[in-house]
Amino acid sequence: MTQLYKLLPFALILIVAQTFAQSFEFEDETIDFPLTTAGSTASEATSLVNLTDETLTVTGFEFFDIYNKAAFAQPSTQGLPNFSGTEELLVQFTPTHNIEHSSLMVVKVEGRGSRAIQLEGAAQYTDSFYDSTFDLSEEDLKLSLTDLTAINYQSLGYNTGRDVLYMQVDNEKVNGQNADVNRIVGVYTGEVREGYQNRGQLQSDGFNCEHSWPQSLGASSEPMKSDLFHLYPTESTANSVRGNTAFGNVSNPEWEVGGSKKGGNRFEPRDEQKGRTARSMLYFATRYYSSTGIDFTWLSGQEQTLKAWNQDYPPTEEELQRGENIGDFQGNRNPFIEHPEFANRISSFSNTSFPIADPQIYVSDPSVEMGFIDAGKTYEYSIVIYNEGNQFVSVSNFEIEDQSIATFKQDQGNVNLAPGQFIELFVEVTPISSDPASTDITFNTNIAGQQDQVIPIYLNGAVGINDQNSEFFALELFPNPTTGLLRLKWDPSQIKPHYVRLFDVSGALAFERKIDSQFSARLNVSQLKAGSYFLQLEHDKGQTTNRVVID
């Protein structure tokens, strides 16, 4: 889980030379969304401003997960624009959780790097019953849910509880599933019983009551024993096989019937039951969190699996209706049926819940890809460094190894980034020739295993292509720019080509073809996206690289 904090009043920026103009920027520092109902979508706009005299191309957008899901996104219809002045960008806010949301949108521009804008929005549930859970997480949320699950609760007693279970809640004739006769399904094996008239007949026909939380581990007394939110009808043999075995995934089953399995001291319900079992267990652990006599240590080894099942098998309409039906009889509600996302905001159900330390650093550009640029002209490339974890992260010792290729000025020295905080690093490049060149940006963090960070800088064809030719070989490319067909022509007395390849600006291979002709080749590149590419011709003397533009 990643918990985000609001950005400090300003973004920390590593500034380049004072006379240097930025390539592009956002018109706003923050996009603020109105209070939004969870599950609905709000839209707001900002503008991206091109500060150069060239047309720039947006190559991508980055958004970040909040509790395993992105709340902010781009409309699917927006695309990746080319822009020469001001370009309006729409951002959508579709929250799942009733919390304050604080995140980033990072926009990536070909050959000019990345910029970030802060995104802020709050969400609420339509049901005021859960208002007390707003913006809560961990132990605070768990205690709030413990209180909520006790509201209006009425213990039915075990006999009445089973009567309600068999004749009402899971009886498909009366629970909304429209069976013609009394009909019930065993949750583990899928076996069906029809035409029974009462609990006694059903029990005589091999069915009984499964306690998801075993009676022997704390569910043998009232009100736990008869709490319908963790009780299910089962075929009695399957119930005995499960016993008080912990839930989990089974790879080598000793027993398997109807999709459920047992093996390796774990019991795995069939897929139809996994999500319901998970939400029953999380409910029980929350509802009776303050009760005595319950073995919560038994739960600890199952929590991650139960959370995964809760997420992978969301509530169906039948489960939602089942929850309402139970509420009609015993008065309370299961919050994990109505809002399964609550589970992502609680790190531990078996112990006191604290955020799990999760230091993470995001670097927008793993390398600086300047492409082919003119000698003597100054260019800027911007990089976003973002603390997307939940711990403070220090970033320090910024250096560029070869400052004849690129420079930056770091005014404020080393930086401690709070969770949710970012910096923008601006790099200034002024090539003195058109020859390929490369160097590295280096810096350090205090994250274990990520202490030494390296961002390579490539310009004028050095982008991972490794030109090996030590002398010039004439290669004609036409038309360039091209809209689909590209012709290559060379002097066969100088070189004998073997392969031609096209790389995008990130260095990824986009096109490859074997060359059979002695003098020329025609390439159909109409399937490639518009943009700049590096054409590499592999021949008997090494490699020759040229820039190609596809319109």
Can you say where each PLM-predicted feature lies in the sequence?
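Domain-level detector of nuclease and nuclease-like folds
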Residues: G200-I356, S367-G371
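N-terminal module-boundary/linker segments of secreted carbohydrate-active enzymes
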Residues: Q124-V187
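Surface-exposed binding patches on compact interaction domains or structured appendages
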Residues: S23-E27, T52-L90, P359-P366, N390-F426
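C-terminal outer-membrane/trafficking sorting elements
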Residues: P419, Q468-F478, T482-D551
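Bacterial Sec-dependent N-terminal signal peptides
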Residues: M1-E25
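Terminal connector regions
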Residues: N98-A123, S434-N460
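Short, solvent-exposed loop/turn segments enriched in Ser/Thr/Gly
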Residues: A38-T46, E87, T96-M105, A375-I383, ...
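Residue-level detector of functionally pivotal "anchor" positions at catalytic/ligand-binding pockets or at interdomain
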Residues: S350-D365, Y458-F478, S493
